[in-house]
Amino acid sequence: MAHWIDIAFCVGCNYQPRAASLAATLREAYPDATVTLTPTGGGRFELSVDGTLVFSKEALGRHLVPGEALALLTRQLSH
């Protein structure tokens, strides 16, 4: 089953380079998944898998740490 991974990022905060870098990493790790970038605002940086939010900068008050996105996706996709 192919999965859908979405990265929502704040344009005004200049999070696009961070989102694009993460998208490239995720496309390499999950070549069968569809990885999309969704421009938003309000300081958001969110990672969703198949419609389920797995990371929210707003909720946690921080950005992803290195390796965290892959760990979150591995955990979510193993269910």
Where on the chain are the PLM-derived regions?
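Domain-level signature for proteins that mediate thiol-based redox and metal-cofactor handling
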Residues: 1-79
